UniProtKB/Swiss-Prot annotation:
Record's cofactor remark: Binds 1 [2Fe-2S] cluster.
Binding site for [2Fe-2S] cluster: 38, 43, 46, 76
UniProt keyword annotation of Chloroplast present: yes
Main location: plastid
One GO CC annotation: chloroplast
UniProt entry keywords in alphabetical sequence: 2Fe-2S, Chloroplast, Electron transport, Iron, Iron-sulfur, Metal-binding, Plastid, Transport
Record-level GO BP terms: electron transport chain
Function: Ferredoxins are iron-sulfur proteins that transfer electrons in a wide variety of metabolic reactions.
Domain 2Fe-2S ferredoxin-type: 2-92
Name of the featured protein: Ferredoxin-1
PANTHER family: FERREDOXIN, FERREDOXIN-2, CHLOROPLASTIC
Family: Belongs to the 2Fe2S plant-type ferredoxin family.
Length: 95
């Protein structure tokens, strides 16, 4: 499992994300309420921004390459590849 720090508007939370599990699924299992809508990488409701670490978003993403290079990720499809620090609730920053 990878240690993942979620920086949310209501505080900072740390959880272990099992290998192959998305950030959103792991957060929900741990009882954290992150925003989401489609759960399929096709919208930006669940948008987060990686501060440190890396994720696999090969499932296909609504984001373009430039947005991904800036560190934006869709937590519903992003699978940690290392320990992570991620800021959640970032949808407003995209537009």
């Amino acid at each position: 499992a990878y240690k993942t720090v979620l920086k949310t508007p209501s505080g900072e939370f740390t959880l272990d994300v099992p290998e192959g599990t998305t950030i959103l699924d792991a957060a929900e299992e741990a009882g954290y309420d992150l925003p989401f809508s489609c759960r399929a990488g096709a919208c930006s409701s669940c948008l987060g921004k990686v501060v440190s670490g890396s994720v696999d978003e090969s499932e296909g993403s609504f984001l373009d390459d430039g947005q991904m290079e800036e560190g934006f990720v869709l937590t519903c499809i992003a699978i940690p590849e290392s320990d992570l620090v991620i800021e959640t609730h970032k949808e407003e920053e995209l537009f």
